[in-house]
Amino acid sequence: RRSSDLMEYINKNSITVDALCGRGLIRAVGKNSCFDSDKMTVGYALYKKEYGIMEPHAHAEETVIITKSVNGYVSWGSDAHHLQRTIALEEGMILHIPENEWHAFHYDEGGCVEIVFIYGQGDNCRPEDNER
């Protein structure tokens, strides 16, 4: 982690992956992140076998950029038990997920998904935030 006047910078590979149920997080900007902010939350999420299956969840409005997808897809819908829509994910796709829309990222056998997540706030960004 380096600083040049006010700008801070780091390579994502230098940030420890936080292994959570269903995904690994690389917390770049926000609460409990490499760069502290209460105004925004940005980082990477890794979906692969070692983290288990991602459960459907809902949270603050989010923008997602797909940085890697091997047999990956996203499902979304009206509640956790009714994810009626599914699309295959491709590198470079941008998803805008409205506030409180239920969704989950998945992959077929041998696959994985990596995303950049962007929130314009510091609260209600991860399922774990809602459990506290």
Segments predicted by a language model, with ranges:
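Conserved metal-binding segment of the jelly-roll/cupin
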Residues: 89-108
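Short histidine-centered beta-strand/loop micro-motifs
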Residues: 31-32, 52-58, 76, 85-87, ...
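A short glycine-rich, His/Asp/Glu-containing loop-to-beta-strand
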Residues: 18-56
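A generic "binding-loop/recognition-motif" signal
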Residues: 59-60, 70, 101-102, 111
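A short beta-strand-loop-beta hairpin characteristic of the jelly-roll/cupin
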Residues: 63-91
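Short, small-residue-biased leader/transition segments that mark boundaries at the very start
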Residues: 1-3
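Double-stranded beta-helix
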Residues: 8-11, 18-22, 38, 78-83, ...
